[in-house]
Amino acid sequence: MDVENLIITTLKDKVKGLTGNEMDIRLDEPPAINMGDYSTNISFRLAKDLKKAPKMIAEDIANSLSILGIERIEAVNGYINFFMNYSDFSKETVSKISDEKENFGKLEKRNEKVILEHTSANPNGPFHIGHGRNMVIGDSLKRILIASGYDVETQYYVNDMGRQEAIVVFGNEKFELDNSKKADHAIGEVYVETNKLLAENEELEQEILNLMKNYESACEAGIENELTEKFKNAVNYSLGGFKETLLTLNIYHDKFVWESEFVKSGMVREVINRLMNTGKVVEDEVYRLDLSDYGIEKKLVLARLNGTSLYSTRDIAYHITKMENCDFAVNLLGADHKLTAVMVNKTLALLGYNEAEVVFYEFISLPEGSMSTRKGRFISMDELFEEAKSRAAEEVRKRGVAQSEEEIEEIAKKIAVGAVRYNIVRIAPEKPMVFRWDEALDFEKVGCPVIQYAHARCSRILENVENISNENLFAYDMNENEKTIVKLLSKLPKIVEKAAEVRKPQIVANYVLDVAQGFNKFYANCPVLKEENETVKNSRLAIVSTTKTVLENTLDLLGIEMPGKM
């Protein structure tokens, strides 16, 4: 039974009866549960039409309503507050979670295909923490959209045709790869050294341009030769390292789409021709697309006069392919790509396609300062994770919960993944963030360890409990801590729905912390195993069991596992 929707429907009927008009009604939640579970201010909105004081309207409405699942309705200073029957509500909530188990929070299947592109870092060095923000938000959003019923395909767009990759291919001829290092790190070292070489020898720049041109010509002609093999090997070598990092963080892509595919298939040439026929292309030192009809002053560079394509044209071809194979597309991009993303979208619109949705994220840094791949000064995601694991292992040893170094390693890895992923995803993407260790590995207030520890506590309580009797569950006067946690647990499906709808995984992250904190208050104030009243004890065990399920299901939406012991 959806009590909230029942209240809204009843209020809408009441308003129509009073005024003859429809009214959009939204319920608020009072700050404390003793003030009610839901509240509405409709009396203030009705005052003008009914020519009565809000206080009187609220009292009249409160006295006239009877709603299934609502124990009492109070009018307070013009507001109408609704109090649920927690005995019935708790039984229903616990029963639903217990029955659905790992499926609790998942919504009905929709007949809609989504292509979600995230990460898509250039294969010229290891992921830095800016890429980390992209991949964590992207993977969390994927999981939330799947739980919300969408058919989701995640894609990684591989830039194998840009200047950066030509520098890597050129550098591989000049410098030896360090095979003792992780592949993407070895490639990164070559990239940095090659950039230094180019800075000192400007005449070598022409060789980079020749590599780019010759690779594109080979791709366009459908030729496989020594050069295409060099590009393919360099990219795949980097991707091997990337996939290791992604796997460590529980991130998986369904498809790696290479930029060159669209040149080989002839689609890039087709896109250029279609755009030429729009009458919106102007020629100066290059071909540019005039998007002023869409309020964009800057022109989009489409191709060089010699006909060779640019990243933008290949990106448009990629987006057309996406749009032809899904109901909607979502891209994760850094805020510095805003103008480019708008230009690509308006080009799609010009050609008659839907625009892609874009989730932009702001810069992320460590307190030590910023990052730069080109100069080689940056913090890689691998280093960030290893540091998190080292700090987590130290904490696990201090707490004495593991029996062996192997177990310490296993627990520390899960804590580290949680610390990195959760600390990134809890912050709204549009806000710049500083990754702080005292927050990421906080066991007391805001870090993922708070949530994982609440789960470990649930596991410990249930360790020796064989079964929980359903007889007379919640047939007593529940206290505020019990009511609060049960109400929180019931919200997961709506949280998933909302987070998917607005594409904001931080909603899920904030919710799961609320659940953990709500459970900790319940644990501190409500004896479970030591409770003498069997009805109360079984009811509280049911709360512990369903809290464990909700914590597992919710952290799974964020790609985070439970250590079990902490």
Swiss-Prot record:
GO MF annotations in UniProt: arginine-tRNA ligase activity; ATP binding
E.C. numbers: 6.1.1.19
Gene3D superfamilies associated with the record: Arginyl tRNA synthetase N-terminal domain (3.30.1360.70), HUPs (3.40.50.620), Isoleucyl-tRNA Synthetase, Domain 1 (1.10.730.10)
Localization per record: Cytoplasm
One Gene Ontology term, aspect cellular component: cytoplasm
Statement: the UniProt record of this protein carries the keyword Signal: no
Keywords: Aminoacyl-tRNA synthetase, ATP-binding, Cytoplasm, Ligase, Nucleotide-binding, Protein biosynthesis
Catalytic activity as recorded in UniProt: tRNA(Arg) + L-arginine + ATP = L-arginyl-tRNA(Arg) + AMP + diphosphate
Family: Belongs to the class-I aminoacyl-tRNA synthetase family.
SUPFAM superfamilies referenced in this protein's UniProt entry, alphabetically: Anticodon-binding domain of a subclass of class I aminoacyl-tRNA synthetases, Arginyl-tRNA synthetase (ArgRS), N-terminal 'additional' domain, Nucleotidylyl transferase
EC top class named in words: ligase
Record flagged with keyword Repeat: no
An example Gene Ontology biological process: arginyl-tRNA aminoacylation
Entry-linked Pfam families: Arg_tRNA_synt_N, DALR_1, tRNA-synt_1d
Motif ('HIGH' region): 121-131
Highest taxon listed in the record's lineage: Archaea
Descriptive protein name: Arginine--tRNA ligase
